[in-house]
Amino acid sequence: MHKILLVEDDPVIRQQVGKMLSEWGFEVVMVEDFMEVLTLFVQSEPHLVLMDIGLPLFNGYHWCQEIRKISKVPIMFLSSRDQAMDIVMAINMGADDFV
């Protein structure tokens, strides 16, 4: 079973996306403590990271860079932001895709 690390600060969106992914057959690890993103990444060994940009403490770009230092796992930003600059920043920070 493929594992997805879901990094989303909005609890409603996190639960909805997590439920949908689980129903599609994925194992989902949901981050709720945003100081633990890197720790949960290492512990869970996901096949994909779905991440929001606007997170408390450190934004998604920061965590993308930190994950890129240790792994080539695909990182996809899942965000309501749709400005070209947000997409360019995500790709420049090491993301593989932006939805």
Residues covered by each model-derived region:
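N-terminal/domain-start alpha-helical segments
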Residues: M1-V99
